[in-house]
Amino acid sequence: MPLSLSKKSSLIAQSEIRAMTLECARVGGINLAQGVCDTELPLPVGQGAKEAIDAGINSYTRYDGLKELRYAIANKMKDYNGIDTDPESEIIVSAGSTGAFYCACLALLNPGDEVILFEPYYGYLINTILAAEAVPTYVGLKAPDWTLSMRRGKGWVN
């Protein structure tokens, strides 16, 4: 029996940013569509990575990230943001926000669920919401300070 893709695979679309990057490369242009970092790696980050490699720290972490990092994030949230969080149940460290958002959507959304999407938004979010068979509801923020009115919130979802 030949291998075939699932029906849900058709719901996953190339992001607009990636499409622009490919088109830019095709015509030999200058890519302004993607936020690719071109700054030097901070010395402490590189040294920390080397120390971890030398110490043999090269295996998968727990599904929710390194315990020490989750606790450091919880401390930062309390000290800097004034928000108490439980690093064991309220903080997850992922390899990136895109993958984390995709996992969260698949874990939390059922077909037909509505998701409030504030404009402007990262285009990939729409593809992820649609892949989870949910329905995006677009809510515009108001210039010049890009705020929203919670009084309008009743009309955001059914």
Predicted regions and their residues:
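Generic N-terminal amphipathic, Lys/Arg-enriched alpha-helix
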Residues: 1-9
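N-terminal small-domain helix-loop-helix segment of the aminotransferase-like
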Residues: 8-95, 103
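Short beta-strands and strand-loop turn motifs
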Residues: 3, 31-34, 138-140, 158
